[in-house]
Amino acid sequence: MGQLADKETKQEIVKKDVKKIKKRKRSYMLTLQTITAALLVLLILVGILKLVFYIGGISRIKLSDEGLTHSDRFENCVVVHGIDVSEHQDEIKWKKVKSSGADFVFIRAGYRSAETGELNEDADFRKNIKKAGKAGIMCGAYFFSQALNEAEAVEEAEYLLKLVKRYDIEMPLVIDYELYNGGRLQQKVEAGEMPASSMYHDVVLAFCRRVEKEGYESAVYANYDMLTNYMDSTLLDDEAVIWAAQYGGACDVKGNYRYWQCAEDAAVGGISGNVDHDIWYIEPNRVYSTLAEGKKNAVSVGDCKIEFDADSYKLKNHKAEPEVTVTYDGKKLRQGRHYILSFVKNTESGTGYAIVRGEGKYKDWVAVPFTIN
């Protein structure tokens, strides 16, 4: 009898334990369902926000110079933000890029294979330069070089000139000169066949002079190592604009660089993944020479009168683009024929800048400030 009672007691205990387990399971299921529902609501809200910002072409991500130390030589300059892109960035929403604070872009137009030496067009160049320009972003183009001599540099320049001739180019045409790991240029350097810094200068300047002959402004892109240990960047100052690459918060290049690639992992609205962040230093109202051989006899925009149609401007469709009149010797110049008009820092209240760049029989460029309320 005692054994039977013990057996019944054990059965009751088991039943109670089973009930407790079922109750806990129901509780866990309810908790899981609650969490799942909350996550679903959150995802829907995020999707709605993304849609709103996509439709409006607005990005909440803003390029900034936080954490960067600028050289004292630029104390009178405005810091303008930009990026550089290639086919590796895939599809780009350029309006969002502009609203992120990117006022200019260097777009890869082509490249020489580091293995075969063959010249190639960047798969997304034409699409990118059309859409970036339409979004109000100033465009320049670069060619990834592996030139071993002056003749190859000229070949690359002529290839680039053919690619850009049908587009409005407001920024320099750039030779991107760097040692690609295992590439033909690095192999020649390691073999001791390019021992003198003059050889590097001759190559990049051959490229620059060829594009300048067609009236374009030229530039040389290179990293700190190339500009310091293979070249003398100070020798390039009077020959070409320098676009220096150095990460870590500061640029120590001795040459008078105008552009600085300060990061390779920037987050920019409209681009999935990381992108290079570039800085452009501009001194307002200073007349910059384009160094273009084909424009030696042209009239400088510094000798022209540049006027706005109002004292201040309001944002319209997330940007301000004033009416600008440019005259020379009493004659009104035509935009597109005599000058190219661009705007930077014009997507929020403060001071924006109209950049007037000489075209045709006119040369040089100047950034003129205007007020945005």
Language-model segments: which ranges?
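N-terminal Lys/Arg-rich, disordered targeting/topogenic segments
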Residues: 1-30
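Functionally critical loop-and-helix segments that line ligand-binding/catalytic clefts
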Residues: 2-3, 67-91, 236-295
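N-terminal Sec-pathway targeting helices
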Residues: 22-44
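Substrate-binding cleft of extracellular glycoside hydrolase catalytic domains
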Residues: 67, 75-206, 212-214
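Aromatic-lined carbohydrate-recognition surfaces of secreted/lumenal glycan-active proteins
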Residues: 214-229
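Solvent-exposed, low-complexity, repeat-rich "mucin-like" stalks and linkers
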Residues: 295-331
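Serine/threonine-rich, repeat-prone extracellular segments and beta-strand-based repeat modules
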Residues: 332-363
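Interdomain boundary/hinge segments at the C-termini of tandem beta-sandwich modules
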Residues: 370-373
